[in-house]
Swiss-Prot record:
C- repeat residue numbers: 145-159, 179-193, 213-228, 247-262
Species this protein is from: Dictyostelium discoideum (Social amoeba)
Gene that produces this protein: ampA
GO cellular component, one term: extracellular region
Protein name as catalogued: Prestalk D11 protein
Organism placement in taxonomy: Eukaryota, Amoebozoa, Evosea, Eumycetozoa, Dictyostelia
A- repeats: 25-64, 88-126
Signal sequence range: 1-25
Amino acid sequence: MLNKLILLLILSSCLVLSVKSEVNVDCSLVRCAQPICKPHYRLNMTDSCCGRCEPCTDVACTLQVKYCQDGEVPTGCCPCTLPPTKPDCSLVKCARPVCKPYYRLNMTDSCCGRCEPCTGVACTLQIKYCKDGEVPTGCCPCTPQPTKKPDCSKVPCPKILKYCQEGELPTGCCPCTPQPTKKPDCSRVPCPKILKYCKEGELPTGCCPCTPQPTKKPDCSDVMCTMDIRYCKNGELPTGCCPCTPQETKVPDCSKAMCTMDIKYCKPGEKPFGCCPCRENLTQ
C-alpha cells in the first residue's frame, strides 16, 4: 500500500513539471519563419513561438476602398486593395478610336483606349457651331455648320403649291410655302364662278384663289368618253381625259319661290337655271 502511494506522488510531480514546461516555453532557442496570413486572417502569438493564423472575429472594417501603398501587402483583418495594374504601353502601337458624339475616350486600363458613354456631364442648351476643322465629338459636341446653297439651275420644281409642315423651313431648291398667318374675312367677297387657272408665279391664296395648273397632261389616246354631260363633284376639277362640266351655280333653295305660268324666253346671255328658269328660244 505504501508503494502505491509513493508511485502516485511521483506521477503527479511529473505531470506538474510537464505542464510548467509547456506554458513557459523558451522561444530564444526556437528558429522558425512566421506564417503570412491571408486577407481577413490575423497572426496569433499567444501560445506559440512561430505563431499561427486564425480568422478575424469582432473586427469592423470600413466599406471605403483603400488601395495598397508602395510595398504594402493586402493582409490582416482589414486588408488594402491592390491598385489596377497599368499595362506597359511602350511596345504597343495602335490608333486611338474616334468616339461618336456624347461618348468619351477612357485611357485608364487600356493602351489604345475605349469609348464609353458620358455620365455626370452637363452641357449647355446653346447651339455651338463647329469651327474650321473641328469634329462633333466628345461629351458636348459642336453642331456642324449648315452646308452651302445647292445649284438649283437644273432642278425642276412642281407647280403645285406645297405648304410647309410643322418645323419645316422654306429652304432648298423647291422650298415650301409658309402657312398663312391669318385667314382673311371672305364672307362678303364675291368671287366669279368661272374657273381661273393660276398664272406663272401666282399662288392659290386669298378669298378667290386660282386653280393650280395641271402638272402633266395624261395620255388619252386609248380613252373612250361618253357624250353624256357629267357635272363636276364637290372639289373635282375639269381635268383629265374625260373632264367634267363645272357647276354653273349652286342649287338654290326654291321652297319659297313663286313662279308664273307664263312662258319666259331666255334673254341673250341668260341660261335656263334657277328656281324659275327661262325657256331657250329655239327659233333664233
